[in-house]
A protein has these predicted regions:
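Conserved active-site loop/cleft motifs that coordinate metal ions or position small ligands
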Residues: 126-130, 164-171
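C-terminal outer-membrane beta-barrel translocator/porin domains of Gram-negative envelope proteins
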Residues: 1-117, 129-130, 137-139, 193
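Outer-membrane beta-barrel "beta-signal"
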Residues: 158, 184-196
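Hydrophobic alpha-helical bundle architecture
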Residues: 112-120, 143-144, 157
Length: 196
């Protein structure tokens, strides 16, 4: 008996038009804007906005199955051979807010409030609270920059020159993941060597 969840890759490869993918023609546009504003004392506000688009030079070939955007999670699950780009959205499991094949468009908005606990040279430590929202789409017909998956939470970051940035976040996803009906709830995210 075979597992109904098992997919034989050789059958799926035969369904793909190999000539269509002989020469991959695509372009990828990304925008990311981040600002740091000192509020009161040591408290810093960090708003940011991101947008990404994957397009095709030749509409007859369509968008390539590689280099697509996968939204959700901490961004650490991006080690794959298909060139996927994982866009972190705390409060949700990794890659849970995109279709199984990824998406061609994404947008993400963040607002983070940071407070440094210590700024020593050997170890800088700061606490943060955040709100984030984002979504991924297949094309501009389904694109709606106001229909977003939302989350909020708090975290802690430690920067040590020998190890880089380490951190932990606790995020609450207010919306269901794809195929779900209940809010996602709390997720724990570990941060290693990257900056949100």
């Amino acid at each position: 008996p075979t597992d109904p969840g098992f997919v034989d890759a050789t059958e799926r490869i035969s369904e793909i038009d190999q000539e269509k993918l002989k020469w991959l023609e695509y372009y990828k546009l990304k925008f990311k804007g981040t600002w740091y504003t000192k509020l009161v004392g040591k408290m810093v506000l960090r708003p940011s906005a991101e947008f990404g688009f994957l397009g095709a030079y030749n509409p007859d070939r369509g968008i390539v199955p590689f280099e697509r955007f996968f939204l959700g999670g901490d961004g650490l699950g991006s080690y794959s051979l298909d060139g996927r780009e994982v866009i972190a959205l705390r409060g949700y499991p990794n890659q849970s807010l995109s279709s199984i094949d990824g998406n061609a468009i994404y947008n993400k908005f963040s607002l983070e409030l940071r407070y440094p606990i210590t700024l020593k040279q050997l170890a800088s430590i700061y606490a943060l609270t955040f709100v984030e929202a984002g979504a991924a789409y297949d094309n501009f017909r389904s694109y709606n920059p106001f229909q977003l998956k939302r989350s909020a939470g708090l975290g802690l970051r430690i920067f040590m020159p020998a190890f880089g940035l380490l951190g932990i976040d606790f995020g609450y996803g207010f919306d269901p993941v794809l195929g779900g009906i209940q809010p996602n709830g709390w997720e724990t995210h570990f941060i290693i060597g990257q900056q949100f």
